[in-house]
Amino acid sequence: MKKIDYAIFDMDGTLLDSMHIWDTASGAFLMMRGIVPKEFDLFRKQGYKAGISYMIDEYKLNMSFDEVLDGLQEILWFYYSNIAPIKDGVKDFLQSLKDNGVKMIVATATESRMAKKALERNGILGYFEDVISMHEIGIHKNDPAAFEYVKNAMHAKGVGYVFEDALYAIETAKSAGYKVIGIEDYSNEDDRDEIKKNVDFYAENYEQVKKYFEL
């Protein structure tokens, strides 16, 4: 087995096959109110807060920011509570890491209550020391301090790996000195070549990850 003492996992697009909800949530919100959306992937393009502000202005919504936020949260809560699926091979890989004494934690942009619900429903919450929402702590994955915060939260030492699907987070983790496993996800297809250049190993699936770590 390759040396690994602790692992920091992203959730959406890495542990869960769930990125499409961020491509459709804004459109679903509008359609539920009888509005035909001009585009569906606002949050991917603009981020969550900017996307909400854009929706209010562009579609002349007679709603406050918080009202739109609450409506979107209902959509997301339903999705993570009932639908968001685990990626193939994840549970088997996590069990192998646990069997070898590897500490694990989740660092996600999703709200912690939603993340924990989805991980619990998929039977993998118990593998992790904690689930940390970067949005809730106010440090995002474009800042190397985010990964140090998460590492310190589980009192980890030794060789650490970050498991990520998004290029910007991969670049940040590398700049912070971490080894990085790039997990393939459709949502980052345009960045695939650049991702491969920046990771220690690029995996199309978790069977390949297991082989990389000689598990």
Describe the residue ranges of each PLM region.
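Conserved phosphate-coupling serine/threonine residues in phosphotransfer and NTP-handling enzymes
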Residues: T14, T108-T110, E184
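N-terminal start-of-chain detector that recognizes signal peptides
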Residues: I75-F78, K103-V106, S133-H135, K174-A176
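Conserved SAM-binding loop
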Residues: L15, M104-A107, I139, V162-F163
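Asp-based, Mg2+/Mn2+-dependent phosphohydrolase catalytic module
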Residues: M1-D5, Q95-K98, S112, K116-L215
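N-terminal helical cap/lid subdomain that shapes the substrate entry/recognition surface
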Residues: K2-K91, K98-N100
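Short beta->alpha linker loops
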Residues: I21, F43-G47, P85-G89, T110, ...
